[in-house]
Amino acid sequence: MDAQTKVIIIDYGSQVTQLIARRVREAGVYSEIHPCIVTAEQVRAMKPAAIILSGGPASVGEKDAPALEKGLLDLGVPVLGICYGMQLLGQDLGGELATSETREYGPADLTLTAPCPLWDGLDLGTTSRVWMSHGDKVKTPPPGFKVVGRTATLEVAAMADEARRIYAVQFHPEVHHSEDGARIINNFLFHVAKLKADWTMSSFVERAVKEMAEVVGDRHVVCALSGGIDSTVVAVLLHKAIGKQLHCIFVDNGVLRLNEGQEVVDYLREHFDLNLKYVQAQERFLSKLHGVDDPEQKRKIIGYTFIEVFDEEAKALGHVDFLAQGTLYPDVIESVSHKGPSAVIKSHHNVGGLPEKMNLKLIEPLRELFKDEVRKVAAELGLPDFIIWRHPFPGPGLAIRVIGEITEERLDILRRADKVVQQELMSSGWYRKVWQGFAVLLPLKTVGVMGDGRTYEHVIALRIVDSVDAMTADWARLPSELLERISSRIINEVKGVNRVVYDISSKPPSTIEWE
């Protein structure tokens, strides 16, 4: 990314640091997140056009609190400190800090008290609703800084040293609760740092295709296709770069949705001429799942069996050097915490176990992108809406939506019920309004009446949720008429079901999936 305008975000452990990066990118400027142990020399080598210091959970005065790296402020680029970042600037540049009487968490009204480039387009003297989350505060600004904003409880809610182009805000402009937050971030990018908006998905596609062609050369790449957007975009990007040197493998594990495997394979073969093998391994997977009702065991069996099948198919190709994966930027960020490599949150592998087992080099074309950017790339590549907007689908597939033992009969019931859910969400316009919607087959039967007879049949639960990132989720408030239509169709069209219930649990405490 050296030729591109770049903003470096120093992460001090905030839960919303990724939102800063996303807001910057939404403005058309490329951004990267780096842990706070990064050195000034390392940052200098990245050639940043601006630096943003994130918030964090620590108190600046604590013994082991993350510190401001010496030399960052000597790089000669504009700096914006947010929350903890503001407190670090206040402390290191000679201001006075204090602990707030009570920790402030939630909305506050910010009064714009003095002219400042961050406020461009906003009226001086007016208030703006912002989001606070802090325990410490800057009591007295450092020399050279002026106070440009305050709240009812904070005399120094924002400060600026325009000569050195260092700005700081105690609130979080990156979260949606801050009503003028996007404008404030954009003002920093374009009015303070004078950056240009040159981060577009068309420029990403052009560069990614060029780089992958150079890296791969005349060698070969294998890619596991799942039918989801990430692996599909990886495959289409690689195909643009290396053509028939890409070998895609789609493994049908027997727990996919109705006609899902064939639909995706047919589309990709027809529109992109992919070198694609469709492996029908349903019997192999289902025989291993026979009699298993523990969800963790289901996951492990499906994971291990997938690795076996994919490994066999890849070896049969005989001349593969690279494994392509749909790793996204949040996966990369989560692999190293804000404390650095010694405090790993998780070691992420998109296809667990495959890289080590197969001794292949990894190629990860999407590792710079957030999920919403992947969707934009998919549109840029000409992929259809049914792939771009497909709801998330778990790796173990319907195996964890059939609660209890998996049989062909129970899978068939769930597939047909789920098809009704998808059709009704789409025809009603709700499919793209919700994060995820699906059917679950419960491990019990209930009494019912159909015609003149008594029935004793299966129960379907509907799980339809709203979310932004799947970290939290709330049950979707669908119109009662839509729920009634879904229920009626399932009971009338899916043989073996006589009851439909709606899951109204939120995450937390419940998870989105039932298993």
From Swiss-Prot:
Q: Name one Pfam family in it.
A: GATase
What EC number(s) has UniProt assigned to this enzyme? Answer: 6.3.5.2
Q: Gene Ontology cellular component?
A: cytosol
User: Which PROSITE patterns does UniProt cross-reference here?
Assistant: GATASE_TYPE_1, GMPS_ATP_PPASE
Keywords, ordered alphabetically: ATP-binding, Glutamine amidotransferase, GMP biosynthesis, Ligase, Nucleotide-binding, Purine biosynthesis
Annotated binding of ATP, by residue: S226, G227, G228, I229, D230, S231, T232
MF terms per GO, please? ATP binding; GMP synthase activity
Q: Where is the GMPS ATP-PPase domain?
A: 199-390
Kindly identify the residues recorded as the active site. Answer: C83 (nucleophile), H172, E174
> Reaction(s) catalyzed by this protein?
XMP + L-glutamine + ATP + H2O = GMP + L-glutamate + AMP + diphosphate + 2 H(+)
Region forming the signal peptide: none
* Keyword Nucleotide-binding found: yes
Q: Does the keyword Transmembrane helix apply?
A: no
The segment(s) forming the Glutamine amidotransferase type-1 domain are 6-198
Pathway noted in the entry: Purine metabolism; GMP biosynthesis; GMP from XMP (L-Gln route): step 1/1
Function, as annotated, reads:
Catalyzes the synthesis of GMP from XMP.
Q: How does it assemble?
A: Homodimer.
Q: What is this protein called?
A: GMP synthase [glutamine-hydrolyzing]
- What species does this protein belong to? Nitratidesulfovibrio vulgaris (strain ATCC 29579 / DSM 644 / CCUG 34227 / NCIMB 8303 / VKM B-1760 / Hildenborough)
Q: Which gene encodes it?
A: guaA
